[in-house]
Design a protein with these regions (language model features):
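Bacterial N-terminal signal peptides
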Residues: 1-8
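Bacterial Sec-dependent N-terminal signal peptides
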Residues: 9-28
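Active-site-proximal segment of zinc-dependent metalloprotease catalytic domains
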Residues: 25-269
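Metalloprotease/metallohydrolase-associated module, dominated by Zn2+-dependent proteases
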Residues: 272-274
Length: 274
Protein backbone atom coordinates (compact mmCIF):
# COMPACT_ATOMS: atom_id res chain seq x y z
CA UNK A 1 0.00 0.00 0.00
CA UNK A 2 2.78 2.40 0.93
CA UNK A 3 4.64 1.60 -2.29
CA UNK A 4 1.46 2.17 -4.31
CA UNK A 5 0.92 5.52 -2.59
CA UNK A 6 4.49 6.61 -3.32
CA UNK A 7 4.14 5.65 -6.97
CA UNK A 8 0.89 7.62 -7.16
CA UNK A 9 2.53 10.73 -5.66
CA UNK A 10 5.49 10.45 -8.04
CA UNK A 11 3.08 10.15 -10.96
CA UNK A 12 1.19 13.27 -9.83
CA UNK A 13 4.45 15.17 -9.45
CA UNK A 14 5.56 14.17 -12.95
CA UNK A 15 2.24 15.30 -14.41
CA UNK A 16 2.62 18.69 -12.72
CA UNK A 17 6.14 19.03 -14.18
CA UNK A 18 4.87 18.09 -17.63
CA UNK A 19 2.03 20.58 -17.28
CA UNK A 20 4.44 23.32 -16.21
CA UNK A 21 6.74 22.52 -19.13
CA UNK A 22 3.85 22.66 -21.58
CA UNK A 23 2.57 25.96 -20.22
CA UNK A 24 5.99 27.56 -20.64
CA UNK A 25 6.27 26.50 -24.28
CA UNK A 26 6.89 29.46 -26.57
CA UNK A 27 3.92 30.42 -28.73
CA UNK A 28 5.10 31.29 -32.21
CA UNK A 29 3.46 33.83 -34.49
CA UNK A 30 0.85 32.40 -36.83
CA UNK A 31 1.42 32.52 -40.57
CA UNK A 32 0.22 35.66 -42.32
CA UNK A 33 -1.09 36.41 -45.77
CA UNK A 34 0.68 39.39 -47.30
CA UNK A 35 -1.15 41.01 -50.20
CA UNK A 36 1.33 43.67 -51.39
CA UNK A 37 2.61 43.53 -54.94
CA UNK A 38 6.20 43.90 -53.65
CA UNK A 39 7.24 41.86 -50.63
CA UNK A 40 10.62 42.90 -49.27
CA UNK A 41 12.60 40.33 -47.23
CA UNK A 42 13.36 41.70 -43.75
CA UNK A 43 15.55 40.21 -41.02
CA UNK A 44 15.06 41.48 -37.47
CA UNK A 45 18.11 40.84 -35.28
CA UNK A 46 17.31 41.19 -31.59
CA UNK A 47 20.51 41.95 -29.67
CA UNK A 48 20.65 41.61 -25.90
CA UNK A 49 23.50 42.02 -23.42
CA UNK A 50 24.53 40.69 -20.02
CA UNK A 51 22.90 43.66 -18.27
CA UNK A 52 20.16 44.36 -20.83
CA UNK A 53 17.73 41.61 -21.78
CA UNK A 54 14.42 41.85 -23.60
CA UNK A 55 11.22 42.54 -21.72
CA UNK A 56 8.92 41.20 -24.43
CA UNK A 57 9.03 37.91 -26.34
CA UNK A 58 10.36 37.23 -29.81
CA UNK A 59 6.80 36.56 -30.94
CA UNK A 60 5.65 39.96 -29.69
CA UNK A 61 8.21 41.58 -31.96
CA UNK A 62 7.49 39.26 -34.90
CA UNK A 63 3.83 40.30 -34.68
CA UNK A 64 4.73 43.97 -34.44
CA UNK A 65 7.12 43.86 -37.41
CA UNK A 66 5.28 41.50 -39.76
CA UNK A 67 1.68 41.50 -38.55
CA UNK A 68 -1.14 42.85 -40.70
CA UNK A 69 -3.50 44.01 -37.94
CA UNK A 70 -4.07 47.61 -36.90
CA UNK A 71 -1.01 48.89 -35.02
CA UNK A 72 1.39 46.50 -36.77
CA UNK A 73 3.96 47.54 -39.36
CA UNK A 74 2.63 45.70 -42.41
CA UNK A 75 -0.86 47.07 -41.82
CA UNK A 76 0.59 50.58 -41.84
CA UNK A 77 2.61 49.90 -45.01
CA UNK A 78 -0.38 48.38 -46.78
CA UNK A 79 -2.37 51.55 -46.12
CA UNK A 80 0.32 54.13 -46.84
CA UNK A 81 1.68 52.50 -50.01
CA UNK A 82 -1.78 51.59 -51.31
CA UNK A 83 -1.05 47.89 -51.25
CA UNK A 84 2.30 48.09 -53.03
CA UNK A 85 4.81 47.22 -50.28
CA UNK A 86 5.07 44.98 -47.24
CA UNK A 87 7.95 43.28 -45.43
CA UNK A 88 8.10 39.49 -45.49
CA UNK A 89 9.96 37.52 -42.79
CA UNK A 90 13.45 36.37 -43.72
CA UNK A 91 14.08 32.64 -43.63
CA UNK A 92 15.93 31.71 -40.42
CA UNK A 93 16.23 28.96 -37.82
CA UNK A 94 16.37 30.92 -34.55
CA UNK A 95 13.65 30.31 -31.97
CA UNK A 96 10.40 30.32 -33.91
CA UNK A 97 11.67 29.19 -37.30
CA UNK A 98 11.06 31.55 -40.22
CA UNK A 99 9.27 34.26 -38.24
CA UNK A 100 11.95 36.67 -39.48
CA UNK A 101 13.41 37.31 -36.02
CA UNK A 102 16.81 36.12 -34.78
CA UNK A 103 17.87 36.71 -31.17
CA UNK A 104 21.56 36.93 -30.26
CA UNK A 105 22.99 37.31 -26.75
CA UNK A 106 26.26 39.13 -26.21
CA UNK A 107 28.43 38.23 -23.21
CA UNK A 108 29.42 41.82 -22.47
CA UNK A 109 27.36 44.67 -21.00
CA UNK A 110 25.39 47.06 -23.19
CA UNK A 111 27.86 49.42 -24.95
CA UNK A 112 25.55 52.41 -24.34
CA UNK A 113 26.61 54.17 -27.54
CA UNK A 114 23.61 56.53 -27.44
CA UNK A 115 24.16 59.08 -30.25
CA UNK A 116 27.51 57.61 -31.27
CA UNK A 117 28.06 54.86 -33.83
CA UNK A 118 26.87 51.35 -32.96
CA UNK A 119 28.27 49.96 -36.25
CA UNK A 120 31.10 47.87 -34.80
CA UNK A 121 28.58 46.20 -32.49
CA UNK A 122 26.26 45.64 -35.46
CA UNK A 123 29.08 43.75 -37.16
CA UNK A 124 29.45 41.50 -34.12
CA UNK A 125 25.70 40.94 -33.86
CA UNK A 126 25.13 40.04 -37.51
CA UNK A 127 28.07 37.64 -37.33
CA UNK A 128 26.46 35.96 -34.31
CA UNK A 129 23.19 35.69 -36.28
CA UNK A 130 24.90 34.03 -39.25
CA UNK A 131 24.46 30.51 -37.88
CA UNK A 132 20.68 30.99 -38.21
CA UNK A 133 20.55 32.58 -41.67
CA UNK A 134 21.89 31.63 -45.10
CA UNK A 135 22.63 35.11 -46.40
CA UNK A 136 23.85 33.85 -49.77
CA UNK A 137 20.28 32.76 -50.56
CA UNK A 138 19.32 36.44 -50.80
CA UNK A 139 21.97 37.30 -53.38
CA UNK A 140 19.46 36.84 -56.17
CA UNK A 141 21.62 38.50 -58.83
CA UNK A 142 24.73 36.51 -57.77
CA UNK A 143 26.99 39.58 -57.67
CA UNK A 144 28.46 38.77 -54.26
CA UNK A 145 26.62 41.59 -52.47
CA UNK A 146 23.24 42.05 -50.83
CA UNK A 147 21.39 45.11 -52.11
CA UNK A 148 18.64 47.21 -50.56
CA UNK A 149 15.99 45.26 -52.48
CA UNK A 150 17.42 41.81 -51.76
CA UNK A 151 17.40 41.94 -47.93
CA UNK A 152 16.67 44.55 -45.30
CA UNK A 153 18.25 44.14 -41.86
CA UNK A 154 17.07 45.98 -38.77
CA UNK A 155 18.66 45.62 -35.34
CA UNK A 156 16.43 45.74 -32.28
CA UNK A 157 18.73 46.45 -29.34
CA UNK A 158 17.68 45.62 -25.77
CA UNK A 159 17.68 48.64 -23.50
CA UNK A 160 16.63 52.17 -24.32
CA UNK A 161 15.93 54.34 -27.35
CA UNK A 162 18.34 57.24 -26.95
CA UNK A 163 16.34 59.53 -29.23
CA UNK A 164 13.81 59.62 -26.38
CA UNK A 165 16.53 59.94 -23.72
CA UNK A 166 15.94 56.39 -22.48
CA UNK A 167 19.45 55.09 -21.82
CA UNK A 168 19.06 52.60 -18.99
CA UNK A 169 20.75 50.14 -18.73
CA UNK A 170 22.14 51.43 -22.02
CA UNK A 171 20.83 53.09 -25.15
CA UNK A 172 21.22 53.30 -28.92
CA UNK A 173 19.89 55.98 -31.24
CA UNK A 174 17.33 54.90 -33.83
CA UNK A 175 18.82 55.47 -37.27
CA UNK A 176 19.50 54.04 -40.70
CA UNK A 177 22.91 53.98 -42.33
CA UNK A 178 25.73 51.72 -43.40
CA UNK A 179 28.17 49.57 -41.51
CA UNK A 180 31.37 51.60 -41.40
CA UNK A 181 33.33 50.45 -38.38
CA UNK A 182 36.32 52.21 -36.83
CA UNK A 183 38.23 48.99 -36.22
CA UNK A 184 41.50 50.60 -35.19
CA UNK A 185 39.76 53.01 -32.83
CA UNK A 186 41.31 56.24 -34.07
CA UNK A 187 38.01 58.00 -34.64
CA UNK A 188 37.98 57.63 -38.43
CA UNK A 189 37.13 55.03 -41.04
CA UNK A 190 38.94 56.34 -44.11
CA UNK A 191 42.21 54.78 -43.03
CA UNK A 192 40.88 51.32 -42.24
CA UNK A 193 42.76 48.47 -43.98
CA UNK A 194 40.90 48.01 -47.25
CA UNK A 195 43.10 45.49 -48.98
CA UNK A 196 42.67 45.46 -52.75
CA UNK A 197 39.12 46.85 -52.82
CA UNK A 198 37.38 49.80 -51.11
CA UNK A 199 34.46 47.49 -50.34
CA UNK A 200 36.50 46.03 -47.49
CA UNK A 201 36.31 49.35 -45.63
CA UNK A 202 32.65 48.81 -44.85
CA UNK A 203 30.12 46.05 -44.51
CA UNK A 204 30.85 42.45 -43.56
CA UNK A 205 31.19 39.24 -45.56
CA UNK A 206 29.05 36.31 -44.43
CA UNK A 207 28.17 33.20 -46.43
CA UNK A 208 30.36 34.58 -49.25
CA UNK A 209 28.30 37.76 -49.71
CA UNK A 210 29.13 41.33 -48.68
CA UNK A 211 26.39 43.09 -46.77
CA UNK A 212 25.33 46.04 -44.56
CA UNK A 213 27.79 48.40 -46.29
CA UNK A 214 27.15 51.59 -48.25
CA UNK A 215 24.04 51.67 -50.41
CA UNK A 216 25.29 54.08 -53.09
CA UNK A 217 25.50 52.96 -56.71
CA UNK A 218 29.28 52.72 -56.30
CA UNK A 219 29.05 50.04 -53.63
CA UNK A 220 25.51 48.67 -53.95
CA UNK A 221 25.14 47.09 -50.50
CA UNK A 222 22.04 47.10 -48.31
CA UNK A 223 23.00 49.16 -45.26
CA UNK A 224 20.99 48.56 -42.09
CA UNK A 225 18.73 50.26 -39.56
CA UNK A 226 18.52 50.10 -35.78
CA UNK A 227 16.42 51.17 -32.80
CA UNK A 228 16.32 50.69 -29.05
CA UNK A 229 13.81 48.34 -27.45
CA UNK A 230 12.24 50.73 -24.95
CA UNK A 231 10.70 54.16 -25.45
CA UNK A 232 9.21 56.22 -22.67
CA UNK A 233 8.68 59.38 -20.69
CA UNK A 234 11.38 58.59 -18.14
CA UNK A 235 13.67 55.69 -17.15
CA UNK A 236 10.90 54.38 -14.86
CA UNK A 237 8.03 54.94 -17.30
CA UNK A 238 8.83 52.99 -20.48
CA UNK A 239 7.16 50.75 -23.04
CA UNK A 240 8.12 48.69 -26.08
CA UNK A 241 9.04 50.80 -29.09
CA UNK A 242 6.02 51.52 -31.26
CA UNK A 243 5.92 51.03 -35.02
CA UNK A 244 6.56 54.72 -35.71
CA UNK A 245 10.31 54.46 -35.23
CA UNK A 246 10.47 51.21 -37.23
CA UNK A 247 8.51 52.66 -40.14
CA UNK A 248 10.64 55.80 -40.02
CA UNK A 249 14.02 54.05 -40.11
CA UNK A 250 12.95 51.46 -42.68
CA UNK A 251 11.62 54.38 -44.73
CA UNK A 252 15.19 55.65 -44.86
CA UNK A 253 16.79 52.23 -45.33
CA UNK A 254 14.55 50.79 -48.05
CA UNK A 255 12.72 53.71 -49.66
CA UNK A 256 15.58 56.23 -49.27
CA UNK A 257 13.11 58.76 -47.88
CA UNK A 258 14.44 62.00 -46.34
CA UNK A 259 13.69 63.31 -42.87
CA UNK A 260 10.75 65.71 -42.98
CA UNK A 261 11.68 67.42 -39.72
CA UNK A 262 14.41 70.03 -39.50
CA UNK A 263 17.85 68.43 -39.33
CA UNK A 264 19.88 71.64 -39.49
CA UNK A 265 18.73 73.34 -36.26
CA UNK A 266 18.08 76.54 -38.25
CA UNK A 267 14.61 75.86 -39.65
CA UNK A 268 11.33 74.09 -39.00
CA UNK A 269 11.37 71.35 -41.60
CA UNK A 270 7.85 71.02 -42.93
CA UNK A 271 6.35 71.95 -39.57
CA UNK A 272 4.09 69.84 -37.41
CA UNK A 273 3.31 67.38 -40.22
CA UNK A 274 6.93 66.17 -40.17
Amino acid sequence: LIVSLLLFLISCSKKEEDSSSTSSTVTCASSRTLTASTKVPLLVVRVQYANATFQSSQTTWADKMFGTSDGQLNHYLDETTYGKYQFTPATETSGCTNDGVVTVSMAENHPDTQGNSWACYAATAITAADSSVNFSAYDTDSNGKLSVAELQVIFLVAGGESAQSINSPGGVWGQAGSLTCDVNGDGGIVDEPCGSTPDNCHGVTLDSVRMLGMTSSTYGQNGFSQFGERQGNSPIDTWDATIGVMAHELGHAYFDLPDLYDTSAIGAGIGYFG
